């Protein structure tokens, strides 16, 4: 999506997504300095959920989601090969398999207001904010699809087959 600002990545949006369409993005590191991912600005209060479907690309690459606030930004780091939350701060984090190697990665119930929503990949698991310290070797990549911001009190997305839509 062109609304997302790129940082040290190239984005190719023609890969098979969890819903079977060719709308997933491949985020590939350019090797440039700085956070390796994409971000968009949102002014939100606390209590939000950030979700993104992610899939492992290069071996040993971790996916991450962060809501940037300037102080103790809520974030979560996900191992996309072992389906585990490696690290999180100021949120409830979870990872759920949805098929074909894809995972629904969630950063929920944030305790701080946020001004940016970021998604990316890294070679390490961090000891602080991924946005401030992520680094991904040039050419390594992850797949991402369906990033969105939700109110935490609304619960998860529910499939309604009677509508004819196909949601994961």
State what each model feature region is.
Residues 1-168:
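Extracellular and organelle-lumenal recognition/adhesion modules and their flexible linkers in secreted
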């Amino acid at each position: 999506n062109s609304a997302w600002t790129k940082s040290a990545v190239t984005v190719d949006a023609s890969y098979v997504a969890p819903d079977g369409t060719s709308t997933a993005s491949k985020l590939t590191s350019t090797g440039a300095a700085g956070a390796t991912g994409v971000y968009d600005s949102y002014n939100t209060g606390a209590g939000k959920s950030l979700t993104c479907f992610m899939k492992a690309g290069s071996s040993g690459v971790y996916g991450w989601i962060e809501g940037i606030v300037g102080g103790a930004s809520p974030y979560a780091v996900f191992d996309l090969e072992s389906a585990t939350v490696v690290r999180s701060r100021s949120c409830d984090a979870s990872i759920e398999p949805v098929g074909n190697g894809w995972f629904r990665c969630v950063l929920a119930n944030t305790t701080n207001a946020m001004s940016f929503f970021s998604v990316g990949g890294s070679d390490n698991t961090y000891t602080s904010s991924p946005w401030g310290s992520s680094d991904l070797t040039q050419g390594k990549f992850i797949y991402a699809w369906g990033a969105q911001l939700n109110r935490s009190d609304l619960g998860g997305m529910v499939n309604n087959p009677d509508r004819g839509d196909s949601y994961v």
